[in-house]
Amino acid sequence: MFDGLCEYEMIRMRNIMERQALFQSLDMEDVKSELTPSRPKHVPSSRGLASVKKVTEVLPPRKSARLAGGLVPDIDRFVPLVEEPEEDNIASLEDLSIKDAFVRAEDEEFVIRTKKLLFDLKFEPKTRHDSTFTPSPSFSDLDWSLSQLTITDDLVAKVVPDRIFSVSLHPGDTRLVCAVAGKVGHVGLWDIMTRDDRFSNGVHLYQPHTRPVNTMNWDQADTSRLVTTSYDGTSRVLDCGLGQWRMLYGEKQYLENGGWTSCHAQQSPNTWLISQGNTGSVVLVDTRVGWELPSTTMKCFERLNPKSLSVHPKQPNVYLTGTNKGGCFIFDIRMARDSSLMTPVSELSGHSRSLSSCVFSRDTGDQVATLASEDKLRLYDTSYLDTPVISPQCAVRHNNQTGRWLTPLRLTWHPARPGVLVCGSMMRPRQIEVWDTEGGDLRPAAQLTGEALGSVTSIVDIHPTRDVIVGGNSSGRCHVFMPAE
């Protein structure tokens, strides 16, 4: 059996065969299969937009004319290159009809369905945003309600074809609709409870912009209007009643000079704050006057980008903004003077790198939470805005290194539970974090996770009156956590 082998090789082969016989007698493979239960591989949800595979062109193989026996053509090495004209990517400043902005405008039946959805949102019962709202006992019990939130494959859908930059849940009481904005100007409306393969399982996709839609929210005064601000230098309003994407802000001369906008915040039912990225200014736009020119321009920074905007809920003249170099400041609109640089009311100290999010608490504005690239989640006490420099009440380590291909993490305060923060996470298993800020401390309250959540959800939003939390990832998918039916 071991002919031709040396003595050492014979001993080695004999030992191997003895061990194999021992394992077979012990039935180790059967024991292993019993101790390790079979777990089927999770298949991602196929709801929403269908994934389009890019067809790569197969080039013919290169052949050498010299080796083939042919003549090598003379090459003029000094032929000047022909420069291709640059594409004019300036955003349109005209109102768009629903059909003009709708991606599947050729499908007449789908167009009728999307118009019906907008018509229904026009008459959706409005959520009460004032302080008289009284939640049910189960709603006010934070620990209990968070424990009831689950996610399944049916609650995951691809809403936009690329990276998600903003998410906003419609605050209506009866219909659950989520607006999602993407990298190349897409805005998708997802009717979460609708399941119909013929019409993308309730996903209605528009493209009113040409560049990333960095900020989007439903109008607090009229929830039938969705406001979007894009890097293409314009802000638009989806008016469900009129069935149009109307202009909110856009200056032709500013766009022709390479201008762009990054975010917005609502100051009152008719006025909006919009940041100009390359000038360091924040403009005040009054919809009663018109969208061509802002009513007030406030020079906040010199050669810095106001990356985030938040208006004080009790003092609408006060707003908060952070920069791409680490500064975080509170300004007062009443202190704006022509084109001169504004003096901040207060500075929130401690930031050394770019801010991805800074927001006032929704109930009183007495707290501010910030996320910055130096891997910190900070909490500030802003009860007294006359303090020139405000130090953080609490700062905890938080991994904010999303890298190049993921949208930076953002914070949001719970609209109906004071002192509760929600944000995305880089931790594994993938999760959405809930933080409790009672007493000025940052304490983890819960981690929302599930088998259907397999990616980083950088952007999150919360329904004001229902236990629903939604997160968007960087491949266009939305994940919804809600109580099981």
Residues of each region from the PLM?
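Intrinsically disordered terminal extensions that flank WD40 beta-propeller domains
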Residues: 1-164
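WD40 beta-propeller repeat fold
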Residues: 102-314, 318, 322-325, 329-330, ...
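Active-site-adjacent structural elements in folded domains
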Residues: 340-345
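Calcium-regulated, polybasic anionic-phospholipid
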Residues: 335
